[in-house]
Regions:
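Periplasmic/ER-lumenal interhelical loops and adjacent helix-loop junctions
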Residues: 2-97, 142-149
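Polar low-complexity intrinsically disordered regions enriched in Ser/Thr and small residues
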Residues: 9-11, 49, 194, 204, ...
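Contiguous transmembrane helix-bundle modules in multi-pass membrane proteins
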Residues: 71-80, 90, 96-213
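Hydrophobic, Leu/Ile/Phe/Ala-enriched alpha-helical segments that form helix-helix packing faces
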Residues: 59-62, 168, 215
Length: 215
C-alpha cells in the first residue's frame, strides 16, 4: 500500500469521473467476444466464443452450488462498469482496468465449471440460450460504434457451439458433440487471433519491428 501511495503517478493530477465515456458502454458488450473492439481504459476482453454460452448455462441451470459464482461474475462485471474500481485497482492514480486479467480468470473458470452441462444441454435449455445469445447479439451490434467481421464470426461460432451440443449430445457416438464443440472453440481462438493480428482487423502485427530493422 505504501508503495502505491508513494508512487510518482499518485501525485499527478488526473481527471476522475463517476462514469466512463458513452463509447465505453456502447462497445462493452461487443468487446466481450471480439479482439477488434476495445472499450478503452485498458479493458482488454475479447474472450473465446464459448464464453457466451457458458455464462448462459451458469444462469439457466438450477444449481445452488453455482450461486456464489453467479454473484462473483455479476459483481466483477459491475466493477468493470464503474470507474472508481479501475482507479482503486490502479494504485489510486488514474482510471484503468489493469485488473481485467482477474475477470478473464473468472470467465475461464465459468467455462470449465459449465462445460459438462453445455455438452449435454437439453433442447429446451438450448433454445433458451440461443434466444439469449440472439438478444445479446442484437444489443451488441446496435450499440457498438462500428460493426466488424470479428464480432459476426464470434457470435455465429457461439450459436454453433450451442446448436452442436443441443442436437448431437444424444447421438450414439457420445463424444461427437464435445469433439465438435472443441473444434469450434479452437476455430474461435484462430478467428480472434487472425482478426487481431491481420491487416483486415486490428493489424497489430504492423506495430512490430522487422528483423532487418533491428541494429
Amino acid at each position: 500500500i505504501l508503495a502505491f501511495i508513494g508512487d510518482g503517478r499518485s501525485s499527478e493530477s488526473y481527471v476522475h469521473t463517476w462514469i466512463y465515456s458513452m463509447d465505453y458502454y456502447r462497445n462493452f458488450l461487443a468487446s466481450m467476444i471480439t479482439c477488434q473492439t476495445k472499450p478503452g481504459y485498458l479493458t482488454h476482453l475479447g474472450y473465446n466464443a464459448v464464453a457466451l454460452p457458458a455464462v448462459c448455462v451458469l444462469f439457466f441451470t438450477k444449481n445452488k452450488s453455482w450461486r456464489p459464482l453467479r454473484l462473483i461474475f455479476l459483481g466483477a462485471t459491475a466493477m468493470l462498469l464503474i470507474p472508481a474500481f479501475g482507479w482503486a485497482f490502479n494504485g489510486f492514480s488514474y482510471m484503468a482496468n489493469r485488473w481485467v486479467w482477474a475477470y478473464g480468470m473468472i470467465i475461464a473458470y465459468i467455462v470449465a465449471v459449465t462445460w459438462q452441462d453445455l455438452c449435454k444441454i437439453s433442447t429446451g435449455k438450448g433454445l433458451g440460450i440461443i434466444i439469449a445469445i440472439a438478444v445479446y447479439s442484437l444489443a451488441a451490434l446496435l450499440m457498438m460504434n462500428e460493426i466488424n467481421h470479428n464480432i459476426i464470426f464470434s457470435l455465429i461460432t457461439a450459436l454453433l457451439i450451442v446448436i452442436v451440443c443441443m442436437i448431437l449430445n444424444k447421438s450414439a457416438k457420445k463424444l461427437i458433440a464435445p469433439v465438435l464443440a472443441v473444434i469450434l472453440v479452437f476455430a474461435s481462438f484462430a478467428g480472434n487471433s487472425a482478426y487481431f493480428f491481420s491487416s483486415h482487423g486490428n493489424n497489430h502485427i504492423a506495430s512490430y519491428v522487422s528483423y532487418g530493422a533491428v541494429n
